Amino acid sequence: MKAFIIPAQLLVCLFFYAARGQSTFPENGIPTETKTYTAYIHANIQISYNQSIRDATLLIQDNKIIDVGNNIPVPKDCVVKDLNGSWIYPSFIEVFSNYGTKYPDKPKQQQYGPKFVSDKSGAYSWNEAIHPELHAADYFAVDEKRAEQLRAMGFGISISQIQDGIMRGTSLMTMLGNEKENKQIVKPVVTQAWSFQKGSSKQDYPSSLMGSIALIRQTLYDAQWYKNGGNEKETNLSLQALNSYLQLPVIFEGTDEYDILRASKIANEFKLNFIIKGNGAEYQIADDIKQTNACVIVPLTYPLPYDVSNPIDASYIPLVNLKHWELAPYNTRILFEKNIPFIITASGCKNEKEFFDNLRKAVALGLPEDAALKALLFEPAHRLNIADLAGALNKNMLANFFISTYSLFSPEFKITSHIINGVSYDVKKDFNDVKAGQYRLMINKMAPLDLLVKYKDNQYSGEISFGEAKYPVSISYAKPNISLTYSLNKDSVGPLNVLTGYVTRDTMKGFSTLAYGSSGMWSAQLIQPEIEVDTTAVEKTYKIPSLMYPFQAFGFDTLPKPKNVLFKNATVWTNEKDGILRNTDVLIINGKISAVGENLSSSGAQVIDATGKHLTSGIIDEHSHIAIYKGVNEGTQSVTAEVRIGDVLLPNDVNIYRQLAGGVTASHLLHGSANAIGGQTQLIKLRWGSNAEAMKFNGWPGFIKFALGENVKQSNWGDQNRVRFPQTRMGVEQLITDAFNRARAYEKEWSNYNKLSPKVKAGITPPRRDLELDALVEILNQQRFITCHSYVQSEINMLMHIADTFGFKVNTFTHILEGYKLADKMKAHGAGASSFSDWWAYKYEVIDAIPHNGALLNNMGIITAFNSDDAEMARRLNQEAAKGVMYGGLSEEEAWKLVTLNPAKLLHVDPYTGSIAKGKDADIVIWSDNPLSNYSRCEQTYVDGICYFNLERNEKLDDYIQAEKKRLIQKMNDAKSGGSQTQPISISVNQLYHCDTDGQYVK
């Protein structure tokens, strides 16, 4: 008898598994110690995302893979499972899931008024949305129903987190079996989980996206301070936990494509490893995402076509919604072609059909199959440092894999069983068990026949070969019963042979009733499964539909570039000592104004005949709230100097384009007026199509929004808002004074610390970095400048007095409708004014407002500007400037400066823009007539020498948009006719922000 020799590697594994067989859990009865091997033979095995083998064997013992490959020796007493050509795939890894987790105790709602501080028991964070001390493993329970759903989608591993809050705690790595939790949890701690959403927190702060970002940044700086000795001053278990896990990857939930850029900025600032979940629209800003080097988590959730049966309703669907429906399935392909690493998640998919249909659709539209597998296996395993356990089928890895009758990307693909931790689970769903391919058919012990079974378009058909002749077979299948009907007569006409029976894996068997009365038994054994042909080769050549930059109506198909342009014979409003020049040329080269004069020439420059046109510098809106995302106010505290508008720019806001059409080239984006010391502002140039960072005005020193009056003291906030200090105008003065006193002390503390030698520093705790006080110190040192919401003269006077006391200047009073009452004091102080042109009597606080205010201030020698504070008014600021002539008798030149040069001076950017002079930025507008005229139209707008608006192009765009909408609506109609589900038309309208807009809570 031949001796059976166990390979050396198996002996090692036997020792390992003997140890593993022990458990801390007692059993009622005789414990069963099973060390049985299981061999899956004659399988097509996808070992990793880019390696597969045919007719191979996978050998496992208990919950580990022992070996995989061709010609693997099968141990004695091994359970052998012949897969007859079925496929084995490693279990997918779901990285964004709340599987099995439940938030322990949600915060309680405060009965009355705002909630400033967490009431959670213990030495934890002051903010309920910050709880890095939570461990999902502590609140984990196996969820058999959900596990079954995920197994049907191919997932055998879940990275589960508590999906609530901003800093959510740690996630765990669990398998998706039904065994007890101690058998399923692989790693109790594997990543951190963060987001911008405060979740179930009942605290007011943060109420905006910029507040969430500031809270994350401040918490991370607090963690550094705590690690460097702050723990000796106070105990904070949240910071302690955060420091313990900062080396872990962070799975960061974003809610839109721009959150990827926002989160990446935080990751870069603190040198953290973020893996960021997107929303499926990453293709819209793929080039920007690539620059971050971020790995993104991509859902396979594609929007349904709209029900466009009503043409009137259909006309209201924005172009961007229609385009997203068409382009969303190309998302993963575009990311792949841009070399952006991504992980696929099933999050958002309702069932396995939606998931696999969308996965196959992505592949059919050009995503390579190995790239799809990489996103489900390799990327999550390596990014989460679990590649030794999951993501492939290599020796000593966990025995997590699924078996399917066809390859993953075949339309006939179905999972028949899923092995989790070595335990096999049937996948319960409606699918066919009959494999297409060549069968050997035996009927009543007669000579075998060749039976070919075909499957196409969810229908079975067959063909029997008898010698050279072939006869069609009608197949009816209702799991597990099958019926085959055929005739061997010429033209298949005549008595029928009927085979009825049932299907068991690769075999069919049952009773036969032949055409001439005999009956008996029959069986058919699968000999050769159908060889799959790549049917997507042609589809993969599909051209990606056109994109827009930004992804919005009126976007560019390619981003415009600066051109050298010579404007001839224009009426030029220089805003310089030369005044208005007739029949004058302006040359722009490389984004700058190169020359202003007569009879200019330049080889290679585009020549534009501006005869009869007026050429001006671009309008600058000193007070705007466009292009801001998820909240213009962080109105929850009286001092929020830590928040930054620059963190939440929305570069695809269509108001940018609309204002370019009104001659605006720069906008100063302000925090609202909900608190005395609000957030840091952001000056942008309207570079339509650029990303948020590229829109920021280079060389601008930085400003911050202050506010006075009824908004600050919450006069009209309701009876429940009588808690936050201050509640009076007197209190506002004390609050601001106290803030600057704290800032002075903070600055001194850091100054004293920085004077110490490195040796002394090493032995003491450094001061705590405070983002709020950092901004206030910049004000004290005139590195950041105030623009203050103001109406009443007494308060205006009060703030100037505070500034004088602390040795700085209030740069700008905005609104300033009582400025005419104390223009002399403003001039003495050095303050500027940014006012409405003619607003009055819209609330009691402005009872003394007059439309002559701006002209009176200007005539006093105060730098005065007119602003919009409104997205619609900003499109007509040229007409607002004209009111300086109508009400105040200003000259046309002085009136025009109210919206061009003067705001540039207020914002400290007049060396760069605001007038037509050699060396300045080519921010230029071409008007059809005098720009102060109601009849004048903006024909072209240039920013840095790039034409972002052209009236002629705009008219063509209108036609294009209508044609494109018509095409896409017809495509949706075709999809509906083809059987696609649809969604009802529901259009959301973006809110236009103003100073007093509040309540944009981050949920």
Predicted regions and their residues:
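Polyanionic/metal-chelating signatures
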Residues: D143-Y283, D388, L408, K414, ...
